[in-house]
Swiss-Prot record:
Family statement drawn from the similarity comment of this UniProt entry: Belongs to the acetyltransferase family. FabY subfamily.
Gene Ontology MF terms: acyltransferase activity, transferring groups other than amino-acyl groups
Keywords of this entry: Acyltransferase, Lipid metabolism, Transferase
Phenotypic effect of disruption: Deletion mutant does not exhibit any growth defect. Combined inactivation of FabH and FabY results in growth arrest, possibly due to the loss of fatty acid biosynthesis.
Record InterPro entries: Acyl_CoA_acyltransferase (IPR016181), GNAT_dom (IPR000182), GNPNAT1-like (IPR039143), HotDog_dom_sf (IPR029069), YiiD_C (IPR012660)
Pathway(s) per entry: Lipid metabolism; fatty acid biosynthesis
Coiled coil: none
Gene coding for it: fabY
The organism of origin for this protein: Escherichia coli (strain K12)
Induction field: In the absence of FabH, expression is positively regulated by the stringent response factors (p)ppGpp and DksA.
The keyword Lipid metabolism belongs to this UniProt entry's keyword annotation: yes
Name of protein: Probable acyltransferase FabY
CDD domains documented for this protein: NAT_SF
Length: 329
């Protein structure tokens, strides 16, 4: 079991005999849902089936088992189209409460949310769980209306997600680039496109699975094409900054080859070694043509290669970079 940095030494020691696991097999999923019903719905005299909802198929699920393989805790994270994650169906068996398993589950789900690039995590906490979530940094927004079939008061809890400051090279430029995408290409924000890394040599982007899947639960080709296009565009933009050049970047031609359907968390990688063209033409007031190759992965497995031809038009002197300018820092 991997350690989460926010857990105290005492908590890590108390949960050492337990193991986090994503339910995957049919048997594991059946046990997972049975546990949800027994812990959360059966005490309220609600029928089997009430422990499931329509979002389960697209959500992230976690469970904790002991050394004998007995299921002792569960939790679910669902990410909506507005880059907001919701924790639901979280439960710990009464026999193992106060051992840090609830904290482990909540922090694991929050870590998944952070990796997906969400802006905040919410939960509908039962009245007796409000204090627990408050200790984890969630802020109580007040009581919410619940169905009459749920005779327990619930409260909306919200926690902003701190972004990971792990960009190795020019994180300030990456922040400007991502903000420019969101402002000028609103679809990129709706898709949840996020810059994951820039090293000066490689540029990596990602997006959540949720909202970018097709009916077959693999990634939608249109979303992957858009992600690859922005990734190639972004590396060219960063190269212009590195060389103190400016220019308006236009995609002139592109095609994509799929080796297999892509599933899992996607990311796109553009490398300077897969780029050809002469950007120095811009310094002479002439347009430049750049060929770029972008690899697309799902769960670390390559699935497609995008090849694009971009035209970079000379910038107007001292215009903003987003419009192709060449202003100095």
């Amino acid at each position: 079991m991997s350690q989460l940095p926010g857990l105290s030494r005492e908590t890590r020691e108390s949960i050492a005999m337990y193991h986090l696991r994503v339910p995957q097999t049919e048997e594991e999923l059946e046990r997972y849902y049975q546990f949800r019903w027994e812990m959360l719905r059966k005490p309220l005299h609600q029928p089997k089936g009430s422990e499931r909802d329509a979002w389960d198929a697209m959500a992230h699920h976690q469970m904790v088992v002991d050394e004998q393989g007995n299921l002792v805790a569960v939790g679910r994270l669902y990410i909506n189209a507005d880059n907001e994650a919701s924790i639901r169906f979280m439960a710990v068996h009464p026999d193992v409460q106060d051992k840090g398993l609830g904290t482990l589950m909540a922090m694991t789900l929050e870590s998944v949310a952070r990796q997906e690039g969400v802006k905040r995590v919410t939960c509908s906490a039962r009245e007796d769980a409000v204090e627990f979530f408050a200790k984890l940094g969630f802020v109580n927004q007040g009581e919410i209306t619940t169905p009459t079939t749920t005779p327990i008061r619930h409260f909306l809890m919200i926690k902003p997600v701190a972004t990971l400051d792990d960009i190795l090279h020019r994180g300030d430029w990456c922040a400007q680039l991502q903000q420019a995408w969101y402002e000028h290409i609103p679809l990129s924000e709706k898709m949840g496109v996020r810059i994951q890394q820039y090293t000066g040599q490689k540029f990596i982007t990602t997006m959540p699975e949720t909202g970018n899947q097709n009916p077959h639960h693999t990634l939608f080709a249109g979303s992957l094409f858009s992600l690859a296009t922005l990734t190639g565009w972004g590396l060219i933009w960063l190269m212009l900054r590195e060389r103190h050049l400016g220019g308006t970047i236009i995609l002139a031609d592109a095609h994509i080859r799929y080796s297999k359907p892509i599933s899992g968390k996607p990311h796109a990688v553009a490398d300077l070694g897969a780029l050809s063209g002469d950007l120095d033409r811009l310094a002479r007031g002439r347009k430049a043509r750049v060929q770029m190759q972008v690899e697309i992965f799902g769960d670390e497995t390559p699935g497609a290669v995008f090849e694009g031809t971009y035209i970079v038009l000379p910038a107007k002197p001292f215009g903003p970079y987003e419009e192709g300018g060449n202003e100095e820092e």
